[in-house]
């Protein structure tokens, strides 16, 4: 049996990794624990990020990271899935979480990565028969960029929501957290223009 764990990370640039598992609301823990890693479908999973209007999520701005660990042999396998924008209106859940001065970015796993998700799922299924404990870690990383003219001295406050299937609604994965925008060289990450 798999144990689901939420090790949620927000990150900007290569530094500023913030373990945000402390920011996972208690009410979201049962939803995380109920996620069935064997039946996860890349075409179904959606992530939403609420960020200040002064920031954007570029094409490489958000990643879903799934890590499975097995006690037998102390083996770990990790898969990173880059997320792309999802067209359409926000769900009622997301609409209720809109705030003045913030935008909600809906994203999903790139459909071309569906075969990798299928391979990852097959790997997890093969572990079912293996003795010992197994665990699944779900992480979301974000790398927002600063829009031209925005204040580079104010770190963005970001919230992350997860939607495991299209039949379910989103739930809060990470409450609003401040994320440093400064890159290792000391500069802010600016959005590309034109």
Per-region residue spans from a language model:
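Beta-strand elements of well-folded, non-transmembrane domains
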Residues: 51-55, 68-72, 142-146
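C-terminal motif of bacterial Sec signal peptides marking the signal peptidase cleavage site
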Residues: 17-20
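Bacterial signal peptide processing site
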Residues: 22-25
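Glycine-rich, aromatic-bearing surface loops/beta-hairpins
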Residues: 128-194
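Structured domain cores in non-transmembrane regions
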Residues: 56-136
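Bacterial N-terminal signal peptides that target proteins for export
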Residues: 1-10
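Post-signal peptide N-terminal segment of mature Sec-exported envelope proteins
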Residues: 29-52
């Amino acid at each position: 049996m798999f144990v689901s764990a939420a090790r949620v990370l927000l990150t900007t640039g290569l530094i500023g990794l913030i373990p945000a598992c402390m920011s996972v609301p208690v009410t979201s823990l049962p939803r995380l624990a109920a996620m069935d890693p064997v039946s996860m479908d890349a075409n179904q999973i959606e992530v939403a990020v609420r960020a200040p209007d002064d920031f954007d999520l570029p094409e490489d701005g958000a990643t879903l990271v799934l890590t499975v660990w097995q006690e037998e042999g102390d083996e770990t396998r990790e898969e990173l899935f880059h997320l792309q924008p999802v067209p359409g209106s926000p769900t009622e859940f997301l609409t209720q979480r809109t705030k003045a001065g913030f935008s909600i970015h809906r994203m999903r796993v790139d459909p071309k990565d569906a075969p990798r998700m299928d391979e990852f799922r097959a790997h997890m299924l093969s572990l079912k028969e293996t003795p010992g404990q197994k665990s699944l870690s779900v992480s979301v990383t974000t790398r927002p960029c600063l829009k031209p003219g925005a204040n580079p001295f104010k770190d963005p406050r970001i919230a992350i929501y997860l939607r495991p299937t299209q039949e379910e609604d989103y739930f809060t994965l990470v409450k609003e957290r401040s994320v440093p925008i400064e890159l290792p060289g000391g500069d802010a990450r600016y959005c590309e223009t034109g």
